[in-house]
Amino acid sequence: MNKHSGNRTAIDPAALEMSIASATEALLAYRHADGHWAFELEADSTIPSEYILLRHYLAEPIDVVLEAKIGNYLRRTQGAHGGWPLVHDGPFDMSASVKSYFALKMIGDSVDAAHMVKAREAIRARGGAANSNVLTRFLLALYGVVSWRAVPVLPIEIVLLPIWSPFHLYKISYWARTTIVPLMVLAVLKPRAKNPKGVGIEELFLQDTKSVGMNPKAPHQSWGWFLLFRGIDGILRVIEPHLPKKLRERAIASALAFTEERLNGEDGMGAIYPSMANIVMMYDALGKDDHFPPRAIARRAIDKLLVIGEEEAYCQPCLSPVWDTALTCHALQEVGGANAVAKAKQGLDWLKPRQVLDVKGDWAVKAPNIRPGGWPFQYNNAHYPDLDDTAVVVMAMDRAQRHAGSKEYATAIARGREWIEGMQSRDGGWAAFDVNNLEYYLNNLPFADHGALLDPPTEDVTARCVSMLAQVGEFTQRSKAVAEGIAYLRRTQHAEGSWYGRWGLNYIYGTWSVLCALNAAGIDHQDPMIRKAVEWLVSIQSWDGGWGEDAISYRLDYSGYEQAPSTSSQTAWALLGLMAAGEVEHPAVARGVNYLKNAQTENGLWDEQRYTATGFPRVFYLRYHGYSKFFPLWALARYRNLRSTNV
């Protein structure tokens, strides 16, 4: 008898099977005709606000219906505090509030309307729009609201620096790189938004807008580095206007070449909104009209991010079909049965040709001898494949071909494995898109007030890569990569037993990821780091049997897990983590399973309004609409499968 069996909450097997069947049927209903899944990916109010402001920047014809729907979305997401949060029911955020107010005013909302008065008072009570972050300030500078003295100098000549330079573009993350290159062109040309309505937001400032200076030091920044870089910024501000014209022209040409090589068709450069928007504004500033092919392509890419409903609309930051499809395939394979397995195989068949095999992207600058073999997060993003997605896809393919007794995906698996092994950073961990992106001093640049300029190794991505390598046959005894990955995870565990989650919120996500990796790598379930993690997960279970965690757990003055209302996805992660640690019979697992069963709606799925994923900690969060559909199903099916072999 298991040590926990006498203290177990009863789970009715028939009811559990009904829950699994209902969730499976509902999940399959979201499948596209070609076999893949793509769910909505919602951020905060900033992206839809920026979309409105982009249209008016370019003086595009006003789409009254679309603007009305985006306006409805913005008004609904306004917080009780008067401003806009970064997450559902979250605290006031200055930059989100300034952009949302600006967009609503641009749409035509009266400044005397109750919601606008409330927003304006909330912004002014917190020091006014001068306290916006650096990217918001760039937008305001482009609109002429603040002067260019309010933003850091971004000399376009940076693109010509040699690779050994401490400020080379390949020393920052892909998302920063693809955003900054067109932004540098804008910073040099200093264009002015067309803004045919002449809308401004001077009323959000407590001082003359033209007197707004540079941002103060951000909390994550070191005084020494900050003062050094602020001094360099001051010097550049003096000399930048006097740099040789020919050098500037060559730098702009280099930036354009960089952009056009990575334009990525109608999926957009980097396949993320900020890059696409900056590219469109860059071409406009260079005098290219809206029929100029690269500009037109980039502009169409942006509209593919829109989600337009009956009453509301918003703009997504990017699309997530590879991630959604791969994780759905995992859930369906866990469910089992002929239909679910067949649909998972069709999803994997959709994924297979999307592997990047012939493009050496930006990652190859630091790993020139590695063959490509990764998958991107989006439909197409060949220059920027994602290690997390690649690991998840390879694991799903490996499981499928083992079940089928075939070698159908063997070549794809081998190339994915080879690429991931070659992308291991020197500290033993893996990052999301780059290798050895460890120049932490760059987060002290005036531009980096967000603290997200880099893509260093993280516990969650490292765990996924270790899981994949172990699943395909690499173990600590004979694999240097896995041994170093395990060592990285061992030393990054927090004292209370958790691991940080960079791309999911937060310590629940990181701990689930690592426990799965340790299990796959054959680490003894009695290992102290596993026992500490189990004890921690059990200790934070909510009264209702679920698990929930708040985004404020990312605060710099870390003091531990921050409880929030239970969510289906975070509960599923906790359950999958505990089961990976051999705790399927633990009473906490049964309580968590009961929570998921009780929270399941009549349509077979789970309602989850809270944000449980992370774009940039403390700056930008995500709500994957698919998370509440496939993760709970995965956990319930895993519980059923383990219990059926453990009674």
From Swiss-Prot:
Pfam families attached to this UniProt entry: SQHop_cyclase_C (PF13243), SQHop_cyclase_N (PF13249)
Pathway noted in the entry: Secondary metabolite biosynthesis; hopanoid biosynthesis
EC number in record: 4.2.1.129, 5.4.99.17
One cellular-component annotation, GO: lipid droplet
Coiled-coil portions: none
Single GO MF descriptor: lyase activity
InterPro entries linked: Hopene-cyclase (IPR006400), SQ_cyclase_C (IPR032696), SQ_cyclase_N (IPR032697), Squalene_cyclase (IPR018333), Terpene_synthase_CS (IPR002365), Terpenoid_cyclase/PrenylTrfase (IPR008930)
Segment forming the signal sequence: none
One of the GO biological process terms: triterpenoid biosynthetic process
Entry annotation: catalytic residues: D388 (proton donor)
PFTB repeat ranges, renumbered to this chain: 67-108, 413-454, 530-577
Keywords assigned by UniProt, alphabetized: Isomerase, Lyase, Plasmid, Repeat
Catalysis: reaction(s): squalene = hop-22(29)-ene; squalene + H2O = hopan-22-ol
SUPFAM superfamilies in alphabetical order: Terpenoid cyclases/Protein prenyltransferases (SSF48239)
Similarity section: Belongs to the terpene cyclase/mutase family.
Role summary: Catalyzes the cyclization of squalene into hopene. Probably part of an operon y4aABCD involved in the synthesis of an isoprenoid compound.
PANTHER family xrefs: LANOSTEROL SYNTHASE (PTHR11764:SF20), TERPENE CYCLASE/MUTASE FAMILY MEMBER (PTHR11764)
Protein name stated in the entry: Probable squalene--hopene cyclase
Annotated source species: Sinorhizobium fredii (strain NBRC 101917 / NGR234)
Phylogenetic classification of the source organism: Bacteria, Pseudomonadati, Pseudomonadota, Alphaproteobacteria, Hyphomicrobiales
Gene name tied to this protein: shc
